[in-house]
Amino acid sequence: MKQIELKILDARIGNEFPLPEYATPGSAGLDLRACLDAAVVLAPGETQLIPTGLAIHIADPGLCATILPRSGLGHKHGIVLGNLVGLIDSDYQGQLMVSVWNRGNTTFTIQPGERIAQLVFMPVVQASFNIVDDFDTSERGEGGFGSSGRH
């Protein structure tokens, strides 16, 4: 298992609020919690930036982290990420913040310590470009937006 540096920015983490952990041996994501002093009420269409009380430093340029929505919050309550996905670069060292958007039709209350998103680590490939006039022919070519069929 890869070791990532974690800085606790709020004393409640690890005491009142659990440290991020994998729910099962097969889990890809670690739950991130709302590190709030009081509940936050999100009206329909509203977006708020929610602190997690944590900072990470991945350090390895071959890795990044993504902040992803929790499927149950999105499906049942319309609570998703305001930026759809958060990308955490390997050299970032600031607090992890979660942009939470209520795309639903009713207000939703986020409680202190509530699980609001998940953190997934992923490999990174940094690419360089080779400028060309034409590409080698492929089966797909320039076809996009459904050109490969519906089913």
Swiss-Prot record:
Q: Name one Pfam family in it.
A: dUTPase
UniProt entry keywords in alphabetical sequence: Hydrolase, Magnesium, Metal-binding, Nucleotide metabolism
Enzyme nomenclature, EC number = 3.6.1.23
Extract the InterPro entries matched here.
dUTPase, dUTPase-like, dUTPase-like_sf, dUTPase_trimeric
Pathway named in the protein's UniProt entry: Pyrimidine metabolism; dUMP biosynthesis; dUMP from dCTP (dUTP route): step 2/2
Q: Which reaction does it catalyse?
A: dUTP + H2O = dUMP + diphosphate + H(+)
User: Which annotated residues bind substrate?
Assistant: R70, S71, G72, N83, L87, I88, D89, M97
Names of required cofactors: Mg(2+)
GO biological processes:
dUMP biosynthetic process; dUTP catabolic process
Q: Which residues form a coiled coil?
A: none
In alphabetical order, the GO MF annotations are: dUTP diphosphatase activity; magnesium ion binding
Q: Which family does it belong to?
A: Belongs to the dUTPase family.
Tell me the PANTHER family matching this sequence.
DEOXYURIDINE 5'-TRIPHOSPHATE NUCLEOTIDOHYDROLASE
Function according to Swiss-Prot or TrEMBL: This enzyme is involved in nucleotide metabolism: it produces dUMP, the immediate precursor of thymidine nucleotides and it decreases the intracellular concentration of dUTP so that uracil cannot be incorporated into DNA.
Would you tell me the protein name for this molecule? Answer: Deoxyuridine 5'-triphosphate nucleotidohydrolase
